[in-house]
């Protein structure tokens, strides 16, 4: 993850306009809270805070641009540290060259990544390094790894969550060994995967759960998957979630965007752009959901849905890179190595593809009939055309010279 690329969205929090009391956005107060961590002070820092967040960064170059980028990154961390100071969350930086020995000791591997130490766990933040995104992520980490549901209203709230992976289990109580195994499994995925539990017989009946049984909900699916062979050990639950974590249709979220993008299918993503709040975008998304439900058993299919409204700073970049209009629904394949892409031809918003047409297009993608190499061939053809034009121009120039000689 390249930390400096995604900080501008949170950097805007450093400035504020005059507002009524109760809506004052925090501004940096000038106090330095981010620690330059080294072998002498790291043990004290780990003991001092309930959670410690460390940015593992490459050595900062002396050029002006690199210095500015680093200062802006540091400012994002400083503001987050200021906001979260009352909650005993500390922040620090580790230089990959100067503090290489410490980095190895702490298990820091990827430059540009932010690592969170919570008790005995090390969690990598793989999202947009913006103050608001980071603060929300850390507040989620402070919560219990399992949320308990014991009423009809809480069950309704659970049902409303449809764009994320979630698990729910029915247990005798908090002292149950099977619940404890479920809770320990949840810690492996917090806060990226939501774990729920109920001790209420009525709630369990509505969910169709038997004692010590756990259901796994894939995003946007109508029905859950019963995890087989109950009761489960912690290891069995962890293994099941890892095996089924790549959903048929998954949403790109600021808090884990890099992890999702890196989880490609042999270097390729099927990407769909659709604004959920836009009528055409909503309609297109519903078609995508239907396609995903009809093909949920296909292990080779995974579509990444991106709502452009979630990433306003990236809209211009995506439009320029992929040569598409993001004010309209789009679906295509993207090569994650070089960003080459091929997009389905959607004539206009009034003529969106049907679920059957989308399935046919996806089938062509999965079979290799449609691929990003076609895009390279088109580029080569364009280059050849340019060369031919240049040759024609040269021939014309030669003819003109002959005429002049005559």
Curated annotation (Swiss-Prot):
| Origin superkingdom | Eukaryota
A Gene Ontology molecular function term for this protein is: calcium ion binding
Give the chief site where it resides: other
Q: Where are the annotated segments for Disordered? A: 365-406
One Pfam entry for this protein is Calsequestrin
Q: Which GO terms describe its biological process?
A: regulation of cardiac muscle contraction by regulation of the release of sequestered calcium ion
Which residue positions does the secretion signal occupy? 1-19
Q: Where in the cell is it found?
A: Sarcoplasmic reticulum lumen
Task: Name it.
Answer: Calsequestrin-2
